């Protein structure tokens, strides 16, 4: 055998068939179990010598432990092809010989598909099997699978070789489902035809049948034979040779040599054309490679075998493997791949089986926790494929996969669950809620334990507070769990809801939550449970947290105050400024706030709450926005009764029915009246923000409203210097007049026929009090004139019908103290008279301005009250 190998030392031996047969005979010999040498040293020495000769023939240097022949040349060698053809049989049939050849075989498998040009070039680590022919690829993969299945590879240097081989397999699968890399050079340029050298064009010229010419053989110099000169370019013109009679033997040999050279030229031209016509990605300019289904299936089998044999070695590239497999499943090669049917020998079916078997095998090694705690590109597609693969796998159902995650979290709680919740939200929405009834029931208990642990983690002194995205993802998870058909029949659904509600209430302290998320989870809970009290568990927890926040016992995130208030108004059927894609929500929040309505009234009446909220949130608008939202909720509740009497007024604001008398007022009556005027202003603001049918204060109470304003105006001259609160009484009284006017006019438009008459009577009672206030002093008259002119301007902005009727009566008020209207007021009055509105007025814009003014006055009054006392 050694002598035979010595005869075959030329890699480009013309007798390639003979070389192939010789090596095939040697491979057949090695695959025979009886070829294993005995214990005799002589036979072992001879076999070692044979292997050394064969390694030399393959171009492998035993001293340098590397190949000295370029991969491209080795791929064409008959010796290599013959050896690769029988390599799987050797590895399968003769383990003793396979173990001896294993290091060399592993290096050969690494070197063979390499794209490096020279053997001395630096080894490339990121390449696929694209350079191998289809048949060679199959043999290559079969050999690798046998090594992974039958041989030990946990020791150096074989372990390093195996890792590199697995990298080649992974790269092959990645190239099959090409994905542009972020690190790819987007400015990569594709060579144009003008940049290709002329000699390359000549060698790459396509051979067409119509370009062939029939010539006779003539005596010619080899240099000129078959050459056509076109300018400076020498182009080879193929010829078909027809002999003329008999030719001498040297001429026949020369013809044979010419024919061989012609075939080589054609093959070289075809290879150049293939390289020039590579299919590339239009975005990143990387080559796009396509492989047959058997190659892909063999790659998947090799990866699964590797994961099963040595999971510790696969750990560094485990996610890359799983992600690539999911990309294969998500990218069908043929139309029938898109169906859910399991097709044997189908690469997509093999990939699904490989994915779920791998996850099941590694489920006891905390693979769930590691996978969910990994940043995944395109997580929606990834988790959709995982759920699809586990759908018909009894050993590991999609729901049981989540249960394993919960068990892993119970054993080892991570520093942050933000990424886990994000991936879990993408995964759980892919699981149907009408299947896997028993696994869903088992999961409820684990989720309860999870939220108890989660609540303890974020409520600790040094705990990591959840972000908005984290809260939103948890809400998505729980909303989907609530939609499970058998949720109410689980072992402890109520305790899970309570644990989640406590966590959600605590989370609202640190991050904002969207209104739609809160509406969705509260509605899902309302529909999932059976008992009425249990249905409102989450809603009641949110409303209670808001009530604790307005008492300043807890601190919510700035935007969550208004968000929870909007949730209450939405449930009451009111229009809110937040756009909602779906309005089919039922949270029962308007019912949950009913026990706290009197506490809400106290919050509205408190002069200092806006200043306190500003300190917590650094926002001037938060206090006013929250007050008007809660005032709207009270107004809606007060107007819910269909009775035309004043029973709701007596229940909520009984002091309105008994205004103080000017002659028999207590010392604190003026301060209380100013507070009541502010409360009435906020209630009317809330009612005007609500729908048209919202009338919390009956129109018949117009007389009592006028009596309160009359009392404040009558006592302002004497009480205004007592405190800062008293100083703002005039401002609040005139704004209440404006709001009551707009309130009555809207009622006259939509519901009440007597509203306008009551409004005229209201101003008939208030106007004398204004005239009486003008008689005190010039300074006070200027203040009253300014407020009264602001009232006229405000009524003009809302296009008040009352202004047209009473303006002639009001004009003398402006000159009651002065002989004529002062200049600073004249300009403002002229602007009102000379600029009539040509468009329909927007009452909402005016309400926003009034709301802002009232809140700013309360803020300034609260800030100045500690420093101004008499």
From Swiss-Prot:
Gene name, Swiss-Prot/TrEMBL: unc-79
Matching InterPro entries: UNC79
Protein name according to UniProt: Uncoordinated protein 79
One cellular component (GO) term of this entry: axon
GO biological process: positive regulation of locomotion; response to anesthetic; response to ethanol; response to toluene; response to xenobiotic stimulus
